[in-house]
């Protein structure tokens, strides 16, 4: 599994103008978590170079700033979720994913929770990667930086509530 997809690999088209060939970072930013029973490793991926300017790497830049589940024995990607499209703010995932067993609507669920620098907690089914609660793609302001094209939307989890205040005062 390549955290920056190479030519012909899934997600390479999200790195426009061949930027996958010369962009760096997009590494495992912090500690991974593993589920021995499922044979899966959950990897919190960092921000690509340059953290605050993406004009040289247009596109959503999959798998940057994503939680990626891979098979422990092969490294094959099983599922992923990108928490920031075309990161411009150094919002890489700051902590190891937390493996939790929860009950949702009366049914037990193996889940993985991933916190973000924005104060969000994203919660997914550990096996399928499906969000436990809806995650909305919301419109966000465009960039005014010359050469930069920010993503028109970003994902916002609806539950649990953010653990940090949202907005600018």
Question: What is each residue range found by the language model?
Answer:
Residues 1-169:
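Noncatalytic, solvent-exposed loop/strand surfaces
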């Amino acid at each position: 599994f390549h955290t920056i997809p190479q030519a012909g690999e899934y997600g390479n088209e999200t790195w426009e103008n061949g930027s996958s060939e010369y962009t760096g970072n997009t590494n495992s930013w912090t500690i991974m978590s593993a589920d021995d029973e499922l044979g899966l490793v959950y990897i919190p991926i960092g921000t690509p170079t340059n953290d605050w300017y993406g004009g040289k790497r247009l596109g959503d830049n999959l798998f940057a700033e994503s939680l990626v589940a891979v098979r422990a024995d092969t490294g094959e990607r099983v599922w992923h979720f990108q928490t920031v499209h075309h990161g411009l703010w150094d919002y890489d995932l700051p902590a190891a994913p937390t493996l939790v067993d929860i009950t949702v609507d009366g049914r037990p669920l193996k889940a993985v929770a991933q916190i973000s620098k924005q104060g969000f907690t994203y919660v997914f089914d550990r096996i399928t990667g499906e969000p436990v609660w809806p995650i909305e793609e919301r419109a966000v302001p465009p960039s005014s930086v010359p050469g930069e094209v920010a993503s028109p939307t970003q994902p916002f989890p609806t539950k649990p509530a953010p653990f940090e205040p949202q907005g600018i005062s």
